[in-house]
């Protein structure tokens, strides 16, 4: 049964929603580990790298931590699945390089791209909100198996420019940036805590439940749910 929504904007989670968590864990995380060391040494003068390294040192409480110590911390945070902003920033830079070199191609579930194209063609504004950095999101959508999907997406949000994904204030920040009433925004995610935070900010929500994903068995509580994007219908009001 399809859920029908009269909304103006859709905000998408990536991992577990548009794309397989297994791909991120099994492909992207190992790639990050293999490239962190080179990134920290070869691009140490890059302002974005330097800022992220400073944030790592601050989180560690070790202002003099060298590149080896920083790399060790990044890998430990990966092991713990910690959503630390500097980790996500540096991952995004590493992945962007990999996508640009053709060493990486992103993953989307088969039902996702047709839905995104249809919604975009119908005038629905599409945005992304992920714990992955904006740089990583940009590379992800640009390097899909079906080509560059970035033209479909109007805005990219992460934990740095919006805030933590389980805090309602982050969703209010995004709504303000969109200039859209909260009840005209639909958030798609597989994570109950994120869905709860979005709803607390006044957004509409759908929990995307895909077999094999980490939150599939847990469910999404009393949120509307869909097993694929094909189970979500958007019928925008013309009034």
Curated annotation (Swiss-Prot):
Keywords: Amino-acid biosynthesis, Hydrolase, Magnesium, Metal-binding, Methionine biosynthesis. Binds 1 Mg(2+) ion per subunit. PANTHER family: ENOLASE-PHOSPHATASE E1 (PTHR20371:SF1). Bifunctional enzyme that catalyzes the enolization of 2,3-diketo-5-methylthiopentyl-1-phosphate (DK-MTP-1-P) into the intermediate 2-hydroxy-3-keto-5-methylthiopentenyl-1-phosphate (HK-MTPenyl-1-P), which is then dephosphorylated to form the acireductone 1,2-dihydroxy-3-keto-5-methylthiopentene (DHK-MTPene). Its EC number is 3.1.3.77. Pathway: Amino-acid biosynthesis; L-methionine biosynthesis via salvage pathway; L-methionine from S-methyl-5-thio-alpha-D-ribose 1-phosphate: step 3/6; Amino-acid biosynthesis; L-methionine biosynthesis via salvage pathway; L-methionine from S-methyl-5-thio-alpha-D-ribose 1-phosphate: step 4/6. The gene is mtnC. The keyword Transmembrane does not apply. This is Enolase-phosphatase E1. Gene3D superfamilies: 1.10.720.60, HAD superfamily/HAD-like (3.40.50.1000). InterPro entries: Enolase-ppase_E1 (IPR023943), HAD-like_sf (IPR036412), HAD_sf (IPR023214). One of its GO terms (biological process) is L-methionine salvage from methylthioadenosine. Monomer. Belongs to the HAD-like hydrolase superfamily. MasA/MtnC family. One of its GO terms (molecular function) is 2,3-diketo-5-methylthiopentyl-1-phosphate enolase activity. It comes from Streptomyces avermitilis (strain ATCC 31267 / DSM 46492 / JCM 5070 / NBRC 14893 / NCIMB 12804 / NRRL 8165 / MA-4680). It holds the Pfam family Hydrolase. Its cofactor is Mg(2+).
């Amino acid at each position: 049964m399809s859920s029908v929504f009269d909304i103006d904007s859709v905000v998408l989670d990536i991992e577990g929603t548009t794309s397989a968590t297994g791909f991120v864990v099994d492909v992207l995380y190992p790639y990050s580990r293999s490239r962190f060391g080179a990134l920290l040494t070869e691009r140490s003068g890059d302002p974005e790298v330097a800022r992220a390294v400073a944030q790592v040192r601050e989180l560690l409480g070790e202002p003099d931590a060298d590149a080896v110590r920083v790399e060790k911390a990044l890998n430990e945070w990966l092991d713990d699945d910690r959503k630390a902003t500097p980790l996500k920033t540096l991952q995004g830079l590493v992945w962007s390089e990999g996508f640009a070199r053709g060493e990486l191609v992103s993953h989307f579930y088969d039902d996702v791209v047709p839905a995104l194209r249809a919604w975009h063609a119908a005038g629905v504004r599409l945005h992304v909100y992920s714990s992955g950095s904006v740089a990583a999101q940009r590379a992800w959508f640009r390097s899909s198996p079906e080509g560059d999907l970035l033209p479909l997406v109007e805005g990219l949000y992460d934990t740095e420019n919006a805030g933590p994904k389980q805090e309602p204030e982050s969703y209010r920040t995004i709504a303000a940036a969109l200039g859209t009433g909260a009840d005209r925004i639909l958030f798609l995610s597989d994570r109950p805590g994120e869905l709860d935070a979005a709803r607390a900010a006044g957004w509409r929500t759908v929990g995307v439940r895909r077999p094999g994903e980490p939150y599939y068995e847990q469910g999404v509580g009393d949120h509307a749910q869909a097993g694929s994007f094909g189970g979500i219908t958007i019928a925008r009001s013309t009034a």
